[in-house]
């Protein structure tokens, strides 16, 4: 019995609105009243996607703020034209130093967060 036979059988029995089973390949194209539980699944998936998009947006904002703070900390005074002709090795060394500094800051931040989590767990253990 395919979907068309199912609808014909309902019409033969006197039902006014033929109901067809919904197959996964075309459930998004069905009418809302025919989708039944698939509407709920679609709504949950949309909500998950929206949550991920919001998280992504917030993380991008945080990243931009951290980058701007890093740039503001590393602002250097104007140098003469002769000093601008540095070798590529010294520029690479400076970039490595900046990356290493940023890595150290992130490591310190992670260790602080880990300590806070550990302290919170200790407090919860004491209360429980």
Swiss-Prot record:
Keyword line: Cytoplasm, Nucleus
Keyword hit for Cytoplasm: yes
Protein's cellular compartments: Cytoplasm; Nucleus
Annotated Basic and acidic residues bias: 1-28
Residue segments, region Disordered: 1-30
Gene source species: Schizosaccharomyces pombe (strain 972 / ATCC 24843)
UniProt keyword GTP-binding, yes or no: no
Any one GO cellular component localisation term in the record: cytosol
This protein's name: Uncharacterized protein C24B10.03
Major place of residence: cytoplasm
């Amino acid at each position: 019995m395919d979907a068309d036979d199912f609808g014909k059988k309902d019409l033969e029995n006197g039902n006014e609105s033929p109901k067809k089973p919904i197959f996964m390949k075309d459930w998004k194209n069905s009418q809302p009243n025919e989708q039944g539980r698939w509407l709920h699944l679609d709504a949950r998936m949309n909500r998950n996607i929206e949550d991920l998009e919001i998280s992504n947006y917030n993380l991008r904002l945080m990243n931009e703020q951290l980058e701007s703070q890093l740039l503001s900390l590393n602002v250097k005074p104007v140098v003469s034209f002769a000093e601008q002709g540095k070798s590529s090795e010294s520029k690479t060394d400076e970039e490595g130093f900046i990356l290493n500094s940023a890595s150290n800051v992130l490591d310190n931040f992670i260790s602080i967060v880990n300590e806070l989590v550990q302290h919170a767990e200790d407090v919860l253990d004491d209360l429980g």
